[in-house]
Amino acid sequence: MEINSSGEEAVVKVRKPYTITKQRERWTEAEHNRFLEALKLYGRAWQRIEEHVGTKTAVQIRSHAQKFFTKLEKEAINNGTSPGQAHDIDIPPPRPKRKPNSPYPRKSCLSSETSTREVQNDKATISNMTNNSTAQMAGDAALEKLQRKEISEKGSCSEVLNLFREVPSASFSSVNKSSSNHGASRGLEPTKTEVKDVVILERDSISNGAGKDAKDINDQEMERLNGIHISSKPDHSHENCLDTSSQQFKPKSNSVETTYVDWSAAKASHYQMDRNGVTGFQATGTEGSHPDQTSDQMGGASGTMNQCIHPTLPVDPKFDGNAAAQPFPHNYAAFAPMMQCHCNQDAYRSFANMSSTFSSMLVSTLLSNPAIHAAARLAASYWPTVDGNTPDPNQENLSESAQGSHAGSPPNMASIVTATVAAASAWWATQGLLPLFPPPIAFPFVPAPSAPFSTADVQRAQEKDIDCPMDNAQKELQETRKQDNFEAMKVIVSSETDESGKGEVSLHTELKISPADKADTKPAAGAETSDVFGNKKKQDRSSCGSNTPSSSDIEADNAPENQEKANDKAKQASCSNSSAGDNNHRRFRSSASTSDSWKEVSEEGRLAFDALFSRERLPQSFSPPQVEGSKEISKEEEDEVTTVTVDLNKNAAIIDQELDTADEPRASFPNELSNLKLKSRRTGFKPYKRCSVEAKENRVPASDEVGTKRIRLESEAST
């Protein structure tokens, strides 16, 4: 061992040098012959070979054997014979490098034959399995490829709404004017079947795109929640579309038949639900093409030639020829479920047959919160029941069809859950959680308030709004569009103290706001969402640390009050259509993926959250200059209860004339709701301890008449 200068031994051990003391002993012919005999007798048993040779050690014999075997292999390669054939010996297999499971596999011939047979059989079975699996995978891939191909073929854009995993999604697409003449009627039926003939589906649907085939295609797709079976039966004739749709769809008790309008290869093949079922509207395309009508109890819809996906929905069939893009005249503000949803029998069933877990969660939330429960009951009273009358779009008196759906018994829990889902979807749509496609001209619908609010006083709204005749409906809608829809929804601020804690609630809803929660009540306007009644005292949308509404908030039923979060200063300052379109584009970017949308914080929510902790004014606290006077009034009367009368039927063009006469009172809540004192409780979760602790210390006690929907921070109220 080497020693360092410090006297310590070296850490690295160096190998000892060695010298070859004796010369390499050559193998004589006799030793080699004995070696060959021992190989035939003992194979690789080196000790026995050593005993047999007698003059060589085991190490020398192994070295000699290695050289000899390599020499034999070279000779065999050169001569083309098997190794060892010249000496009639079988070269024993080499020593294994690692310890195998079976160390000397001497039965190589038998094992090789059986293994090859097993491999062939396995290959056959594996090939069958892979053929089946690849057929299924190819079927799924063919569906996806077909959908993507249809999206990208004509350059049309599609934003897909996915509330739940693999449930039918509503598609809002722009349609090119060069789409071919093709209408398809499709329905959804909950049967659990396997994927079948998907390649045939792709081939036939592509040929259907040319408008030549009228084949019946069964593309059956396993859906995870409740197995939705899609039977698409397209027909390329426009005139018989309603007839064929009513023939193809047979009414079933538990069927989920959602209308599906297919423009060949120009639209994404997703599910499109039309929302004109409750009031019996007729949808007319902006190019004056065939109206998109709903069939009674069939859920069929006729996809028409060159039809715009954002149709104007006039009040009367006389207005079908109108080609101007008008705001959506919604009769009952309680339903803005999605952008285009059939509120008829089939859409009701599709809502009711969603996930049982989601429904039970909604039921528990409704039962634990009386205010939301009361509002949902009112909304459900106007929602079509399962066995009730379904409005007929061909009726001349559309008010009868509008009243027919809610002229029955009090709503059950299923209808309440369904109406709550619709209201929540409407609120999500207006708030930007759900992607909406920006319209090419203006907003094609009024994102109307989604439910009545908790109130304690009954007052009539303006008589001119109630008694608007049917003849002036179109004129009024065009006027509102010319004035940039500033007059679409009027908010009349009257400071009246709350004298009675009970009362009936009319559709012209008055919502009472206490000083503790003076938030922006901003109804969504017709073509713009820029009309804002702004108050100084704001409630932060994310004051609890989360952008999602807690279960105690009446936000699913309070869309105009929740709309202000999505509006920043620039949007409210500008009243042009481009600003509204840009805002919708921003909503799409902020909520592009909706699979985990309840976990995401949108762009506006992040701005509001930053402004809260920097103690600045929140985005919803900015208001147009024409409302500054009302802000000062509301600040002076801080100790009083402010009554805001929201006219929900300004643009609804008053479908039910019988309810809207000047002599008769408005339709009101059910009797059991009129005596119910609506009070909301805080049952939501508290994600951040800091916010909740601070809010507990600074919370203002509220009276019985006023529900504290949000926690207000005093330092924020002073801004």
Curated annotation (Swiss-Prot):
Residues 46-69 bind DNA. Plants overexpressing CCA1 have a reduced number of tillers. Plants silencing CCA1 have an increased number of tillers. SMART domains: SANT. One of its GO terms (cellular component) is nucleus. It comes from Oryza sativa subsp. japonica. This is Protein CCA1. Residues 171-185 have a biased composition (Low complexity). Pfam families: Myb_DNA-binding. Keywords: DNA-binding, Growth regulation, Nucleus, Stress response, Transcription, Transcription regulation. Residues 499-521, 562-571, 706-719 have a biased composition (Basic and acidic residues). Residues 19-73 form the HTH myb-type domain. SUPFAM superfamilies: Homeodomain-like. The keyword Oxidoreductase does not apply. PROSITE patterns: HTH_MYB (PS51294). Expressed in leaves, shoots, inflorescences, embryos, endosperm and seeds.
